[in-house]
């Protein structure tokens, strides 16, 4: 999981996406249905990277050789502070197969949801 953490912290999104399984499942903190497949998850990761300011991981939980990890983070959306956790499961071949995000407090989660809606609205309206 260290490779993923380092890729995110350095802003190397190409390296982070390269660690995703083709059939990755991403569970958003604000959308009920999961996103499935690298083609759906990659644009979300890139949008989140544009929206979250001062993003930093503060804690990593899990056996480095194990399949399941939790990466605790802090960030900001505008004037809203938030903290959250990325729960990550590595599947066969060590690729990230499941990615589940939780965020608190509600005010931070709502600010993130609105900022993400604005980021993704143009591509949704054009069908891209």
Which residue ranges define each predicted feature?
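Short acidic-aromatic low-complexity motifs
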Residues: 1-19
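Hydrophobic pocket/interface hotspot
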Residues: 4, 16-17, 24, 37, ...
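A beta-strand edge to alpha-helix "cap/lid" segment located at domain peripheries
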Residues: 46-128
């Amino acid at each position: 999981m260290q490779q993923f953490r380092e890729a995110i912290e350095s802003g190397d999104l190409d390296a982070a996406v390269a660690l995703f399984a083709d059939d990755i499942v991403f569970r958003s903190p604000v959308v009920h249905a999961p996103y499935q497949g690298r083609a759906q998850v990659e644009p979300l990761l890139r949008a989140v990277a544009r929206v979250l300011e001062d993003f930093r991981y503060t804690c990593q939980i899990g056996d480095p050789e194990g399949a399941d990890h939790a990466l605790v983070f802090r960030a900001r959306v505008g004037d809203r502070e938030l903290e959250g956790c990325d729960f990550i499961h590595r599947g066969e071949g060590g690729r990230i197969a499941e990615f589940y995000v939780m965020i608190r407090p509600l005010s931070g989660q709502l600010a993130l949801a609105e900022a993400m809606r604005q980021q993704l609205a143009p591509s949704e309206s054009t069908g891209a």
